[in-house]
Amino acid sequence: MALLKKINQILLLLLVLTVCAILYNKVHQVPSALKNETVDLESPEEMEEEIPVVICAAAGRMGAAVAAISSIYSNTEANVLFYIVGLKTTLPHIHKWIENSKLKEIKFQVVEFNPMVLKGKIRQDASRPELLQPLNFVRFYLPLLIQKHEKVIYLDDDIIVQGDIQELYDTKLAPGHAAAFSDDCDLPSTHEIVRSVGMQNTYMGFLDYRKQAIRDLGISPSTCSFNPGVIVANMTEWKHQRITKQLEKWMQRNVEENLYSSTLGGGVATSPMLIVFHGKYSTINPMWHIRHLGWSPDTRYSEHFLQEAKLLHWNGRYKPWDYPSVHTDLWENWFIPDPSGKFKLTRPDS
């Protein structure tokens, strides 16, 4: 009996040791599934950071977005994910254009923008109705449309990119800054263009300083403005600072008090951004936003200067898919004809 009891004790001890050994292995060994993930993470393709680029595709000017996307895709090896934002009626068209052209290889998502979010926030202004189009305000709502990224690039559709978009994405944002823009006074080479077409590059050109609400901001009217057609944004800071809510507040105040209008320099989308981001933004390399190409059908930059530029922006009335306009050859290099034939370039011989 004593022998049997001793055998049972030994068996119990062995059982306890076996259980301990199993538990030790489970705690300290890397599971096979995790090992596989580790191998995958070490592969260059998986390590490559995704670069989200937001661009709008508006009815009547969808070819602009296509040319912009084409130029970005052709000039980089980076892992770019395009978020193409449009209204519900335009989404099928942009899908077909991309899927039936050489852009079918790009990574993209088509995102619907609901214009109802703007109800009661836009003051109607007949002087430049194109500036009141809903997609002009997509940049205000970036965190609501693009949710899985920490850093996002937003681009107007009337641009082409001649550099590697990775460089723009690598723009450093200072702590506490939700966005980076290009200052309107940052590049001496553009000053002559600005003077020749009578453009404003200060807050005076965008805000109505006759209004008390504007004067109460304490911003000097001679403060250099910035252009929000190219944005590198930090989504965490944007949400933390409630940037979208701040922009909406100034939109609603403009409806009530007419603090700015499209008769001023940048219309109704730039002005609230100038207010909200005053003194609280980082800067983009000036060569990554050469603008004003659309302000005059006659005034031109030098060919050498344009070749050095990383990004060209036809902000203004004179767009490169229309006539008259300048430097259209640089834009048309990246244009891909519409497979459906709906979008056509306007040229003097057409």
What does each model-found stretch correspond to?
Residues 2-350:
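Glycosyltransferase catalytic domains, chiefly GT-A lineage
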